[in-house]
């Protein structure tokens, strides 16, 4: 996978890798995990699975000129159907965002109007960070492959300033813990307090 280093470049290869990673995490979520808490206090595992699929559908709506607010914040599925639901949402996402020209066209989301590639970067964040959320909530490996996580972190630092973030769906950055991996540092940059969810070796 090539390393994307600026928000002006095509971020879709990163999104494809992040979607593949999210799919692997979802595949390993079992029925006994569904009511477990997650780092997103408004979601348990079941509703976070539904929210992850919803982010893809909402991004597809943004890219196609629709209103993402018509899509529920969290989709629903039977406990054994989450991988299939995510597959359908990923397929729908790419039906819209495979259009190269869309990266440079203005699109409108609830938080503003901007070039399409910015909407792709937002989905990259959703996939990697909510993948991290699901992984730590279900006892899976939470760190993405370093090339993916480092590239995504570099892009998001360029695309999303530390401040101001008024009107954006991100909180202020959180100071990373010493030794935090790139995926955790990405979550921190996007406002996630990861400390309660990560066990660290005492020295």
Language-model features, listed with the residues they occupy:
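Extended, alpha-helix-rich binding/interface surfaces that flank or overlap catalytic cores
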Residues: 48
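Structured surface interface patches that mediate subunit assembly and partner/cofactor docking
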Residues: 2-21, 28-41, 57, 61-203
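Glycine-rich loop at the start of a catalytic domain that most often binds anionic cofactors/ligands
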Residues: 51-52
């Amino acid at each position: 996978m090539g390393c994307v280093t600026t928000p002006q470049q095509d971020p879709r290869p990163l999104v494809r890798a992040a979607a593949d990673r999210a799919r692997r995490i979802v595949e390993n979520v079992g029925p006994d995990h569904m009511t477990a808490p997650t780092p997103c206090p408004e979601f348990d595992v079941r509703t976070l699975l539904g929210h992850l699929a919803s982010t893809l559908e909402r991004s597809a709506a943004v890219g196609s000129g629709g209103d993402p607010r018509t899509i529920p914040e969290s989709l629903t599925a039977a406990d054994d159907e989450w991988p299939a639901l995510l597959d359908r949402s990923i397929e729908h996402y790419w039906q819209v965002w495979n259009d190269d020209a869309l990266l440079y066209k203005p699109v409108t989301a609830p938080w503003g109007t901007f070039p399409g590639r910015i909407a792709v970067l937002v989905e990259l964040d959703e996939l990697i960070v909510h993948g991290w959320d699901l992984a730590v909530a279900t006892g899976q490996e939470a760190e993405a492959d370093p090339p993916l996580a480092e590239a995504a972190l570099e892009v998001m630092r360029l695309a999303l300033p530390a401040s101001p973030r008024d009107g954006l769906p991100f909180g202020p950055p959180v100071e990373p813990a010493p030794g935090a991996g790139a995926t955790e540092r990405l979550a921190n940059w996007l406002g996630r307090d990861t400390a309660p969810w990560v066990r660290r070796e005492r020295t």
